[in-house]
Amino acid sequence: MEKQNKMKYYHNNRCRKSREGLAFLESKNIHPEIINYLENRISKDDLIDLLKKLNVTAAELIRKSESVYKENIRGKNLSNDQLVDWMIREPKLIERPILVNNELAEIGRPKENFLKIIT
């Protein structure tokens, strides 16, 4: 019997773009498992797996507008692993929203990016 994976949505309810992305998916009758990653912290292994599914580096996933980034990371030559560690410690540094569909993932900026992995 084939195992069916449910889509996962890395969500921050306080973020307008994240709420808009979820509403967009629901308008397409897609109801993913919602992961409030600020409350239920993502593990390092899961974040590394997410980077692979997104096909991006940690530097590409990090939110550069956050004060934590500006005060601690900007201008430093940090490795991918060091940036992952920062995102684990400070999950608000992780760009959002993210939809995962099996082995594929997309950042919903713009929300229409999700169409690449749901159609």
Model-inferred region functions:
Residues 1-2, 16, 29, 61, ...:
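Alpha-helical protein-protein interaction elements
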Residues 2-27, 32-37:
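Local sequence-structure signature of Cys/Sec-based thiol-disulfide redox active-site neighborhoods
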Residues 39-119:
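Thiol/selenol-based redox catalytic cores and closely related redox-interacting motifs
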